[in-house]
């Protein structure tokens, strides 16, 4: 009493599938108040519906429906049987091959195909169209005489290369000239001071190198001969001696030129060819941009102003070589 017959495995699978469909379809049917107004479903209901239908489609594509479980959604045969493949016996296969061979033999030969001819070029003639019977109109029309090309050619004027304005070149040449004059003046004064000091050291004893004009009443600190500051009476005498030494150097140089009678002899003795080769090698290493050259000279000037005497001499020689190469290049 009270006992029910045991359910078969197929029945249990069908009931399980129906329970699964009930749970999935329950989210597709809105319950209670749909929205505040009670007319339209909310976005949550729509998202649940989309997610449920995706799950149902996935299960259907994978063939996961049990037998008979799709009747809730109207799926009478969720898992259709595969179409049976035809099976050929060796005798039937041989007959089919013989029939195909006979068909190939009895088939009429193919007709020779005519090679496609190129279409004749179409030309517009005045007599082809009554509207174009007046030939003089076509001959006098500018488009008929000079037809335009298929692809229009746009002619643009050649772009002129922008040249550096003359003001910048003039300013650069002026700066280079001032720089050369400045360094030449400094080096000439330095050489003249050394020659003046050497001259004073030869003509005066070592114990009497003090300036004789510092005891004349001027409020000037003690200093050596040849180093007179501004305000000392010996300042003018110092530069007078320097001017005399400079004139003597010019006189010696003029005498050498007069004795040689030709400046080319001195240049040949100085091996001018080797110097030109050196200048050409240095010019190949220099940048071609004028702004870069200005930056290089400015950097060398800073190094010269913040370095010792030995470094100043090397930097000065480098600057003179660079400037000489620039003039040699031009």
Curated annotation (Swiss-Prot):
GO cellular component: membrane; viral envelope; virion membrane
Segments for region (Pre-S): 2-163
Topological domain ranges for the Cytoplasmic compartment: 2-238, 187-238, 314-330
Sequence segments annotated as region (TM1): 166-186
Family affiliation: Belongs to the avihepadnavirus major surface antigen family.
This protein's name: Large envelope protein
Region (TM2): 239-259
Matching InterPro entries: HBV_HBSAG
Reported function: The large envelope protein exists in two topological conformations, one which is termed 'external' or Le-HBsAg and the other 'internal' or Li-HBsAg. In its external conformation the protein attaches the virus to cell receptors and thereby initiating infection. This interaction determines the species specificity and liver tropism. The large envelope protein probably also assumes fusion between virion and host membranes. In its internal conformation the protein plays a role in virion morphogenesis and mediates the contact with the nucleocapsid like a matrix protein.
Lineage of origin: Viruses, Riboviria, Pararnavirae, Artverviricota, Revtraviricetes
Native source organism of the sequence: Duck hepatitis B virus (isolate Shanghai/DHBVQCA34)
Segments on the Extracellular side according to the record's topology features: 2-165, 260-292
Region (TM3): 293-313
Gene that encodes the chain: S
Lipidation (N-myristoyl glycine): 2
Region feature Disordered, mapped onto this chain: 68-125
Compositionally biased intervals (Basic and acidic residues): 92-109
Major site of localization recorded for this protein: virion
Subunit structure: Large internal envelope protein interacts with capsid protein.
